[in-house]
């Protein structure tokens, strides 16, 4: 079957830059799906996108749909005709379903049959519908109309190219009649661009100062920005999202170096970077020490004969924004950071939980407790907690919300606060996302954990639990943040104590009955997904969850030990034995003896197990107390022999009540020894 290349390009007014790549990929995916559904084979489909165009090039597309055979079975002959040979409703209904007269139905077999070959349609007839369906299915949140047209799209359309081989496909889509005339660069080549065939698309447009390949433009910008930064003895900050957005804004990228006055470097560099990236789409430059250079890179969409004019224009545009940041910084420094807390007394954190200042005071006290328990400085943690929200009332954060915490850090340093206190004002928000950076100081860790626990307890305490995809207070992220800090920073905090302390601070503002258990369960539930991501078997997590350690660090140490224990040859048998013991003890209704009495033993294996347990207790209990859980489980693995022998030789449910109770006490002692680490019956 013959095949030709196919090209579709929809020209528009400037498309939303943040959505361009997504729209192009969806357009291509929709066409691929349409071709496959139609049975039209092809070699490859490639999406192209620039600010004023979406395009898809399909290589070696079949020119004809294959023929299809339809074979339908109808009702049995005895149901199709009555005793007089007249067709029944079943026969007539089958004929209607097939779209033919009953005379055309095959009656030669035991059932009515209908067979027909449907000739495949030419691709040229199918492609307009496939393209239109793909465009209709694009992920466009809000479509628009233009002029007096009824058609809707993300932006008004300007032209349409549809070529199959060298032939134009005659059709109209979104108010545009298909042709072979594209458009070049808006300034360098504003006229029509003749596309002779699909395979020449990229080069035809390149000659008109348009790089239609999004990936090519992206790479060109990234390399040139890196090169220019190096020439300035610096390195560029190139966030992937910003690079994508800039790529979507230009058809013919020309990166240029610009500069600003060095006096602006007195302003926190994060504020300068934020305004240059977010508002102006510039790439900022850092020196070898990570400090901001008074230069930036803009990406022009034109190859100017006088680049200095473009540079000058961008420098004039950015100056007022940097001046604003400088003004806010100087204004804020006119009063102590702590004084901004007065403004927070009028800012509501949550209607039922008081003001942001109330929260800062709670965080301060809780951070002090956490620091005290984890080897930090209580006074500094309390000071950092008290100042933790002050910068929310500053002019800087009011203008640049992303500066919360960062502004506080600079203002605290400026006032002579200890460095760990200043750092904590920023580190309280860490980690800012999955895999995000953790606090570098004990003070920062204490405030970060305190802030998150206060939010968890408060929001849970008023019954606003996260449901499904709705989590307005980011409680899942807060719980994960607490766990990451405590585990990865090796901080041994009793979360039961910390959560109860947090509850006590709210007084009657929260419903305290059962609240601690609810919050702790929510926090430790988050560990399951964490371990699954790390490749830890869920059974190891469940075995530790069953013994309910109060410390996240302790929990993790136990899980790692159980995971290692599972690799031992004795693990499977001991897990099964523990499960058997657990089931037996659950069914024992009498009161267990306080101690095991050897005088009730009547089998040598009972003595052997008892002796082995005594030796194991002496070795394991100190190990468990020292949290050397892996070594403890390795030592407990030696019990496999005595345990197997016991169950093989002894009937636990002896007729004599005293013997029976004593055997249950022996098994309870065995189970208790393992429960000092984890419930390994969960591994069985």
Curated annotation (Swiss-Prot):
<dbReference type="InterPro" id="IPR006194">
    <property type="entry name" value="Gly-tRNA-synth_heterodimer"/>
</dbReference>
<dbReference type="GO" id="GO:0006420">
    <property type="term" value="P:arginyl-tRNA aminoacylation"/>
</dbReference>
<dbReference type="Pfam" id="PF05746">
    <property type="entry name" value="DALR_1"/>
</dbReference>
<comment type="similarity">
    <text>Belongs to the class-II aminoacyl-tRNA synthetase family.</text>
</comment>
<dbReference type="GO" id="GO:0004814">
    <property type="term" value="F:arginine-tRNA ligase activity"/>
</dbReference>
<keyword id="KW-0030">Aminoacyl-tRNA synthetase</keyword>
<dbReference type="Pfam" id="PF02092">
    <property type="entry name" value="tRNA_synt_2f"/>
</dbReference>
<keyword id="KW-0067">ATP-binding</keyword>
<dbReference type="InterPro" id="IPR008909">
    <property type="entry name" value="DALR_anticod-bd"/>
</dbReference>
<keyword id="KW-0436">Ligase</keyword>
<dbReference type="GO" id="GO:0005829">
    <property type="term" value="C:cytosol"/>
</dbReference>
<dbReference type="GO" id="GO:0004820">
    <property type="term" value="F:glycine-tRNA ligase activity"/>
</dbReference>
<keyword id="KW-0963">Cytoplasm</keyword>
<comment type="subunit">
    <text>Tetramer of two alpha and two beta subunits.</text>
</comment>
<keyword id="KW-0547">Nucleotide-binding</keyword>
<dbReference type="InterPro" id="IPR015944">
    <property type="entry name" value="Gly-tRNA-synth_bsu"/>
</dbReference>
<dbReference type="GO" id="GO:0005524">
    <property type="term" value="F:ATP binding"/>
</dbReference>
<dbReference type="GO" id="GO:0006426">
    <property type="term" value="P:glycyl-tRNA aminoacylation"/>
</dbReference>
<protein>
    <recommendedName>
        <fullName>Glycine--tRNA ligase beta subunit</fullName>
        <ecNumber>6.1.1.14</ecNumber>
    </recommendedName>
</protein>
<keyword id="KW-0648">Protein biosynthesis</keyword>
């Amino acid at each position: 079957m013959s095949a030709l290349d196919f090209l579709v390009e929809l020209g528009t007014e400037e498309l939303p830059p943040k959505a361009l790549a997504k729209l192009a990929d969806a357009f291509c995916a929709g066409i691929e799906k349409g071709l496959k559904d139609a049975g039209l084979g092809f070699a490859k489909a490639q999406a192209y996108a620039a600010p004023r165009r979406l395009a898809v090039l399909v290589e070696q597309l079949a020119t004809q749909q294959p023929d299809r055979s339809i074979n339908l079975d109808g009702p049995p002959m005895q149901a199709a005709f009555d005793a007089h040979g007249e067709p029944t409703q079943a026969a007539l209904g089958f004929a209607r379903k097939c779209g033919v007269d009953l005379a055309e139905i095959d009656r030669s077999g035991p059932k009515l049959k209908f067979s027909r070959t449907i000739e495949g349609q030419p691709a040229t007839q199918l492609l307009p519908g496939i393209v239109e369906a793909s465009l209709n299915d694009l992920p466009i949140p809000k479509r628009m109309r233009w002029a007096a047209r009824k058609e809707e799209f993300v932006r008004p359309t300007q032209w349409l190219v549809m070529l199959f081989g060298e032939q134009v496909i005659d059709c109209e889509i979104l108010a545009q009649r298909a042709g072979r005339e594209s458009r070049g660069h808006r300034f360098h080549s504003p006229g029509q661009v003749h596309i002779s065939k699909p395979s020449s698309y990229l080069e035809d447009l390149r000659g008109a100062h348009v790089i239609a390949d999004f990936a090519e433009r992206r790479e060109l910008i990234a390399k040139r920005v890196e090169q220019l930064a190096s020439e300035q003895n610096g390195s560029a900050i190139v966030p992937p999202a910003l690079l994508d957005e800039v790529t979507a804004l230009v058809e013919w990228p020309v990166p240029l170096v610009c500069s600003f006055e060095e006096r602006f470097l007195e302003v926190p560099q994060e504020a300068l970077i934020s305004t240059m990236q977010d508002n102006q789409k510039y790439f900022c430059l850092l020196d070898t020490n990570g400090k901001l250079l008074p230069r930036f890179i803009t990406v022009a969409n034109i190859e100017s004969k006088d680049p200095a004019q473009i540079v000058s224009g961008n420098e004039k545009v950015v100056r007022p924004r940097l001046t604003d940041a400088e003004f806010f910084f100087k204004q804020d420094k006119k009063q102590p950071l702590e004084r901004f807390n007065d403004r927070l007394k009028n800012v509501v954190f949550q209607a039922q939980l008081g003001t942001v200042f109330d929260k800062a005071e709670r965080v301060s006290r809780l951070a002090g407790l956490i620091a005290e328990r984890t080897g930090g400085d209580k006074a500094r943690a309390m000071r950092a907690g008290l100042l933790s929200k002050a910068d929310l009332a500053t002019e800087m954060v009011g203008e640049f919300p992303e500066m919360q915490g960062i502004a506080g850090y600079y203002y605290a340093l400026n006032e002579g606060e200890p460095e760990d206190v200043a750092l904590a004002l920023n580190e309280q928000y860490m980690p800012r996302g999955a895999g995000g950076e953790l606090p570098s100081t004990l003070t920062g860790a204490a405030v970060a954990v305190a802030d998150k626990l206060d939010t968890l307890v408060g929001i849970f305490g008023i019954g606003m639990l996260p449901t499904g995809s709705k989590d307005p207070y980011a409680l899942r992220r807060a719980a994960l943040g607490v766990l990451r800090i405590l585990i990865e920073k090796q901080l041994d905090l009793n979360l039961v104590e910390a959560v109860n302390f947090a509850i006590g601070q709210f007084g009657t503002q929260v419903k305290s009955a059962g609240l601690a258990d609810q919050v702790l369960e929510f926090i430790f539930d988050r560990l399951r997904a964490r371990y699954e991501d790390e490749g830890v078997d869920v059974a190891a997590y469940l075995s530790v969850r069953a013994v309910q350690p109060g410390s996240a660090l302790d929990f993790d140490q136990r899980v790692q030990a159980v995971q290692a224990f599972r690799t031992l040859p004795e693990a499977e048998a001991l897990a099964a034995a523990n499960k058997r013991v657990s089931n037996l003890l659950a069914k024992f209704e009498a009161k267990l003896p306080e101690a095991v009495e050897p005088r009730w033993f009547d089998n040598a294996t009972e003595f052997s197990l008892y002796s082995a347990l005594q030796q194991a207790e002496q070795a394991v209990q100190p190990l468990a107390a020292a949290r050397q859980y892996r070594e403890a489980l390795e030592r407990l693995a030696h019990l496999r022999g005595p345990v197997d022998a016991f169950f093989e030789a002894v009937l636990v449910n002896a007729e004599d009540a005293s013997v029976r109770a004593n055997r249950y006490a022996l098994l309870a002692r065995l189970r208790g020894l393992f429960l000092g680490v984890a419930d390994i019956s969960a591994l069985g």
